[in-house]
Amino acid sequence: MEESKSSVASRLMSVKRTSGKSYGRIAEETGLTNVYVAQLLRRQAQLKADTAPKLQAALPELTDELLQEMMKPPLRSYDPHLIQEPTVYRLNEAVMHFGESIKEIINEEFGDGIMSAIDFYCSVDKVKGVDGKDRVVLTFDGKYLPHTEQKSEHMVSRLRLQGD
């Protein structure tokens, strides 16, 4: 019987806790972003074979069994109750509040399109503000994807049907 995603994630988080390392420290040791490390340990991203030895060196308690599990394509999903967690709620609120303006600036700078969440990098950093207080910096670094004009002459499935 296959182990559930939440069970594997729980085991992975236990390995992280045992290590005493932060996501940032693990990221430095593996060459990944801190958010990607968290995604790996929560089974929201797939561990690539060439990264596995670096992650195992950073987290020596990672078993070969867990590494193999992490290399399987994950079920990228989330608990629908997660929105109730205050940090996640405020992040969602910020995106909703600034979303229309961000969309307009993307369109102004790039044209009609979107920012990919597939070809995407994300990090969380801590800086001091001008007032000396801690500030959170979230970086979303996604590939620009233009919307395409849907011309039937470019639709491969139709071209194949016409050629038959």
UniProtKB/Swiss-Prot annotation:
Q: Which gene encodes it?
A: CYN
Q: Does the keyword Lyase apply?
A: yes
Per the entry, what this protein does is: Catalyzes the reaction of cyanate with bicarbonate to produce ammonia and carbon dioxide.
Tell me which Pfam families the record gives: Cyanate_lyase
Q: Does the keyword Disulfide bond apply?
A: no
Q: Which UniProt keywords apply?
A: Lyase
Protein name as catalogued: Cyanate hydratase
Annotated source species:
Vitis vinifera (Grape)
- Name the EC number(s): 4.2.1.104
Reactions listed under catalytic activity: cyanate + hydrogencarbonate + 3 H(+) = NH4(+) + 2 CO2
